[in-house]
């Protein structure tokens, strides 16, 4: 009887303890995820700003969490869409990864564990537990998935070749080590950097258009003939943009970079001494180091951080990283401090030229503000600020992605369902910006890429066709001005694509003659009119040798199922009315 009473008392005690445990929650604080930067679980926002830097999906990430009792063992369970992905045991604070260059530890109080990339998805939730307690559920603010394709297309100019400069094996691709480090610096899910199908551009001359610094057009044969340090680079950017457009890559997550390899008047390699970037294209030297990552930043739409700070559009003083979150490199398994490492060249006398934090330590500059060279030993690149990663993260958010596994061949991110969904291309704004979202009508076929320049004021050597390229590429839709049935669709204001010629007219036609005697006509969505005046007056700039309007550049692809024998560019004013051989003016003609 006494034994029974004692047993009942013991069971009652255990029940009370269990009830107390069941009614309490494991307390967790300061939950962070580290991939490109170390971010709070809700992401990072800025005062008086509507943007948020979100945690990256499909990227292995370091989870950090702080608990009241650091001596206990903790686990974390991860769900995605309420499906359990798995359970992991966190490492205690002593096992937190180190800081670059043996710098100050990021934390001495955080448990941590790497979360597999397949678990890092929107609609993710996590729960921590010990043997007796469980935490509430936490919901990381996961962003959209961006998989970047980067085309590398070297320009060998003025006699530069593999022997007197650098071979294509160096200029036309980046190593896996470089690619692996780049992805650690960019808020992307993946990076695919490849040599462009064209492979390389080899030209003995370059046409500089009129208008830059109020100068006339010029044909040059060495880099010393440029009239300012960025003139050649500016032309290269225009060509890259044209090739990107000719392949229908404008709506997609595609960047271009052109290593610029050219010879000077002495016949020797001439360093470009800088770079230029913007609008998803960039150019610079061939080394794929500081200039490359800086110009890639411009390609994403990032300005110089110092100028942006002065205009109130960058939160950290003078383009520095003072206030930015630390970075983290999964490949090196170490934190990246915002302070300049003490064992690199930039550290010496840095207090004379760099921003100092409250402890008088020198603070790194952003990659977009002279930050090249601030990286620790063993790294190729320094850091972007967390604030700049928002621009990188959002740059391709509205991209239309080609994916054969979707019924239409395209997908687009849905910000409501937080996943990619089937997208059906359509023509917006009555065709003002092209047909079917500016996407190709054929992909990955043999094409010729044709690049034409013309000057309306001369000299004659500015009007020419560069050597054509044959490669794999995409084809864009064109209307045939000799086909009245097709022209019905682009009559201004009254047709299916009523604004197709409203940007600045449709005043030029390409004629391709093939070796078999057949011909092809293509009306260009380009003209000599002002905005929204497809039949309006022609501007005066076309006869001004110092105006950019007096120079014309046309870049397009044609299918390489037949061999062209002649390519011609005609001025066909009001081309939406048709091609009239008696009134058409031949601008450029070249036989092959």
Curated annotation (Swiss-Prot):
Entry cofactors: Zn(2+)
Disulphide bond pairs: none
CC terms in the record's Gene Ontology section: extracellular region
Signal peptide positions on this chain: 1-19
Keyword Zinc (UniProt): yes
Localization of this protein: Secreted
Record-listed Zn(2+) binding positions: 294, 298, 304
Family under the similarity heading: Belongs to the dictomallein family.
Keywords: Hydrolase, Metal-binding, Metalloprotease, Protease, Secreted, Signal, Zinc
EC number: 3.4.24.-
Any single biological process term in GO: proteolysis
The UniProt record lists the keyword S-adenosyl-L-methionine: no
Broad class of where this protein is predominantly found: secreted
Database matches in PROSITE patterns: PEPTIDASE_M66
Top-level taxon in the UniProt lineage: Eukaryota
Name listed for the protein in its UniProt record: Dictomallein-1
EC top class named in words: hydrolase
Active site residues per record: 295
Co-factor binding details: Binds 1 zinc ion per subunit.
Peptidase M66 domain segment(s): 140-402
Annotated GO MF terms: metal ion binding; metalloendopeptidase activity
């Amino acid at each position: 009887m006494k034994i029974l009473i004692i047993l009942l008392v013991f069971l009652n005690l255990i029940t009370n303890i269990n009830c107390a445990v069941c009614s309490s929650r494991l307390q967790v604080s300061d939950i962070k995820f580290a991939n490109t930067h170390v971010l709070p679980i809700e992401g990072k926002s800025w005062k008086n700003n509507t943007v948020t830097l979100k945690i990256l999906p499909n990227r292995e990430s370091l989870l950090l969490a702080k608990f009241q009792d650091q001596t206990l063992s903790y686990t974390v369970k991860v769900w995605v869409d309420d499906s359990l992905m798995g359970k992991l045991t966190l490492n205690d604070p002593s096992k937190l990864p180190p800081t670059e260059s043996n710098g100050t530890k990021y934390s001495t109080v955080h448990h941590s564990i790497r979360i597999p990339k397949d678990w890092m998805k929107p609609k993710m939730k996590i729960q921590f537990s010990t043997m007796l307690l469980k935490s509430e559920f936490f919901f990381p603010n996961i962003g959209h998935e961006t998989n970047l394709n980067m085309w590398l297309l070297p320009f060998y100019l003025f006699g530069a070749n593999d022997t007197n400069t650098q071979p294509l094996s160096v200029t036309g691709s980046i190593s896996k080590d470089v690619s692996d480090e780049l992805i650690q610096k960019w808020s992307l899910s993946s990076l695919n950097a490849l040599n462009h199908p064209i492979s390389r551009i080899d030209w003995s001359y370059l046409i500089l258009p009129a208008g830059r610094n109020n100068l006339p057009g010029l044909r040059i044969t060495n880099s010393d003939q440029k009239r300012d340090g960025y003139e050649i680079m500016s032309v290269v950017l225009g060509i890259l943009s044209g090739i990107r457009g000719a392949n229908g890559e404008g709506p997609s997550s595609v960047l271009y970079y052109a290593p610029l390899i050219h010879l000077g008047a002495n016949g020797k390699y001439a360093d470009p001494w800088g770079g230029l970037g913007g609008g998803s294209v960039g150019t610079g030297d061939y080394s794929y180091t500081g200039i490359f990552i800086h110009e890639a930043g411009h390609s994403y739409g990032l300005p110089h951080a110092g100028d942006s700070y002065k205009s109130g559009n960058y939160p950290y003083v003078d383009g520095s990283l003072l206030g930015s979150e630390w970075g983290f490199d999964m490949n090196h398994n170490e934190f990246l401090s915002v302070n300049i490492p003490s064992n690199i060249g930039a550290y010496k006398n840095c207090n004379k030229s760099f921003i100092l934090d409250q402890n008088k330590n020198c603070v790194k500059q952003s990659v977009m503000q002279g930050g090249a060279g601030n990286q620790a030993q063993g790294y190729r690149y320094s850091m972007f600020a967390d604030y700049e990663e928002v621009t990188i993260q959002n740059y391709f958010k509205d991209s239309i992605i080609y994916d054969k596994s979707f019924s239409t061949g395209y997908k687009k991110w849905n910000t409501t369902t937080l996943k990619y969904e089937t997208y059906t291309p359509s023509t917006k704004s009555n065709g003002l910006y092209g047909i079917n979202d500016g996407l190709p009508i054929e992909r990955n076929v043999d094409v010729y890429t044709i690049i034409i320049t013309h000057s309306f004021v001369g000299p004659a050597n500015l009007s020419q066709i560069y050597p054509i390229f044959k490669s794999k590429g995409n084809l864009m839709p064109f209307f045939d001005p000799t086909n009245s049935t097709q022209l019905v669709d682009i009559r201004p204001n009254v047709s299916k694509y009523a604004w197709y010629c409203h940007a600045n007219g449709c005043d030029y036609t390409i004629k391709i003659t093939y070796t078999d005697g057949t011909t092809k006509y293509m009306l260009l969505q380009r003209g000599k009119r002002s905005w929204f005046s497809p039949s309006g007056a022609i501007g005066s700039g076309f006869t001004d040798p110092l105006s950019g309007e007096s120079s014309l550049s046309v870049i397009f692809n044609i299918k390489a199922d037949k061999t062209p024998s002649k390519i011609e560019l005609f001025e066909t004013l009001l081309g939406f009315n048709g091609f009239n051989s008696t009134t058409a003016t031949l601008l450029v003609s070249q036989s092959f």
